[in-house]
């Protein structure tokens, strides 16, 4: 079997738009750093993917009372979110673990883009990356997978990237930038797997 590489997955294929979501609102978050690294990797060596970082910090808390027109209308920030989600070919979640779960800000975005009369997430590929303590944020990632079942998201299963951020060698600098070369290569493999899976799903829909 031919190994999955940038050349085998991207040759003569359209560029896929990856809507990327950071579950942390902190400016120097490791998870923001992971999204920046993903952007750099796609620009450098994965021409078939383009990262679109979606800022969720300005969303109001999910509240059906803010919906209008029988679930067709939303506040402007929510409409913008839903447009970005609908326009995406696949998703990347940089998701920290808070109390064994996902962050309130990420869950809020998931709820807004699945509310009303249309679930905007449905039937597309997704990947999760996380960083944390001994479990690397894995427990929060597993909870996100559970939420994704109802949203009809199709998560890649391998490779997984749960970074033990406090273990040597250092993985991030003080600004949250990913500085560890091995971890960067692991992130690249996640992106290649997401790319290949998203293309397979698109081909299945066309067939």
Predicted regions and their residues:
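N-terminal beta-loop-helix "entrance" segment that forms/cooperates
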Residues: 53-73, 169-171
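N-terminal beta1-alpha1 ligand-phosphate binding loop
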Residues: 12-47
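Helix-loop-strand module that forms the ligand-binding subsite of alpha/beta enzymes
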Residues: 71-152
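A general structural signal for well-ordered alpha-helical segments in protein cores
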Residues: 18, 31, 35, 78, ...
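Glycine-rich phosphate/pyrophosphate-binding loop and the adjoining helix
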Residues: 2-14, 154-207
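A generic structural motif
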Residues: 43-52, 154
């Amino acid at each position: 079997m031919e190994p999955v590489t940038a050349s085998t997955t991207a040759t003569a294929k359209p560029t896929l738009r990856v809507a990327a979501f950071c579950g942390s609102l902190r400016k120097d978050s490791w998870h923001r750093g992971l999204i920046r690294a993903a952007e750099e990797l796609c620009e450098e060596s994965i021409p078939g993917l383009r990262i679109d970082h979606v800022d969720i910090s300005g969303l109001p808390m999910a509240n059906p009372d803010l919906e209008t027109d029988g679930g067709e209308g939303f506040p402007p920030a929510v409409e913008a979110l839903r447009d970005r989600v609908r326009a995406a070919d696949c998703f990347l979640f940089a998701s920290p673990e808070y109390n064994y779960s996902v962050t309130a800000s990420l869950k809020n975005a998931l709820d807004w883009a699945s509310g009303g009369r249309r679930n905007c997430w449905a039937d597309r590929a997704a990947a999760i990356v996380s960083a944390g303590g001994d479990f690397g944020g894995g427990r929060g990632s597993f909870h996100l997978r559970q939420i994704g079942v109802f949203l009809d998201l199709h998560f890649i299963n391998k490779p997984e990237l749960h970074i033990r951020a406090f273990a040597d060698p250092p993985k991030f600098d003080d600004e949250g930038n990913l500085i560890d070369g091995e971890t960067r290569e692991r992130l690249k493999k996640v992106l290649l797997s997401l790319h290949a899976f998203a293309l397979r799903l698109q081909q299945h829909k066309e067939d």
